[in-house]
Amino acid sequence: MVNGEEYVETPNLIHDEETRKDVKFNLGIELLAGTLAGVSSCILFYPLECVEAKLQVQSSSTAVAATMLGLKKNGGSGSGSSSSSSISHQTPNGPIAMAKSILRNEGFKGFYQGVSPTILGNAVNWGVYFSIYRATNHWWNSTDINGNQYQGPAWVGHSVSAITAGVITTAIVNPFWVLKIRLATSKKYSGMKHAFQSILRSEGVGGFWKGVGVSFIGVSEGLFQFVSYEYILNQMKESNLKMNGGELSVGNYLFAGGTARLIAGVLTYPYLLIRSSLQSETCPYKSMSEAVKGIYKTNGIKGFYKGIGPNLARSIPPAAFMLYIVEFFRDTLTNFSQ
């Protein structure tokens, strides 16, 4: 106790498992800091996210078209080859071609198609995620099941916190991602309100939770990312011991954050593609297993990684800076509240 305030030793988001600092936990500040960080990141990097979403949905749509043409060809139409060729010419192949297509057909504003639900989704996503993550970390490192302060490796608490935050956040935020995918890939909606009403009318409340099952698999993304991040930081700290006593530079943190995101992105990207496909209005698949079979049958293993380039280009920079953005807002809000 210090002046009536309770302080506990809690691992900082960017500290290795050996390092702890005294932190006064404030759920409101954590929620607001995560919200502001999510909005800032979304505004800066949404164009790449839009390109990525269009490529992911295009992958499943192309797979369906190819399957239907194959059926027609087997039925004796004889036009399968030429039609298949026309499909490949009509659809942009790759992130650069997709970006050019968006700019040519929709102008610069096309890169921000569907941005409204994404801003709201990011605000809720990171606000909820970081507040739950920090709250779980606070609880985990305050006591164990016997009421004693936890003294084990910090990565265990990080893992439990990441899984807990990921599951709860996914369940809450999924409707925003459904709206984002619909607005980013379809021109039939005049805005977020129209899309919301249309989905509710034609698909019911359940339509907003399309793809939520596969989204839960994505909880592993945060787990892979954070464990990798902690490990890389620890290795760099050990290598810096002889030079500067183990102090880590800003570059060290950015490298660790970017590399950890790269590892997590490569391992979990297929689920992102399947989730986007299931949430798309034109998706012909009724389940995750059906989507996996359809994509694999048409494009093989590489089909599960279509669009991974813009995904990594979009996600690595904000991942490398996100923790610092959160720390900045957290420190600013803490100082302002005192």
UniProtKB/Swiss-Prot annotation:
Keyword Membrane part of the UniProt annotation: yes
Role according to the record: Mitochondrial solute carriers shuttle metabolites, nucleotides, and cofactors through the mitochondrial inner membrane. Transports folate across the inner membranes of mitochondria.
UniProt keyword annotations, A-Z: Membrane, Mitochondrion, Mitochondrion inner membrane, Repeat, Transmembrane, Transmembrane helix, Transport
Membrane topology: Multi-pass membrane protein
Mitochondrial intermembrane topology ranges: 1-24, 131-158, 225-253, 329-338
Intervals, Mitochondrial matrix compartment: 46-109, 180-203, 275-307
Database matches in PROSITE patterns: SOLCAR
Higher taxonomy: Eukaryota, Amoebozoa, Evosea, Eumycetozoa, Dictyostelia
Organism name: Dictyostelium discoideum (Social amoeba)
Name of the molecule in the record: Mitochondrial substrate carrier family protein I
Induction: Regulated by the MADS-box transcription factor srfA during development.
InterPro entries named in the record: Mitochondrial_sb/sol_carrier, Mt_carrier_dom_sf, SLC25A32-like
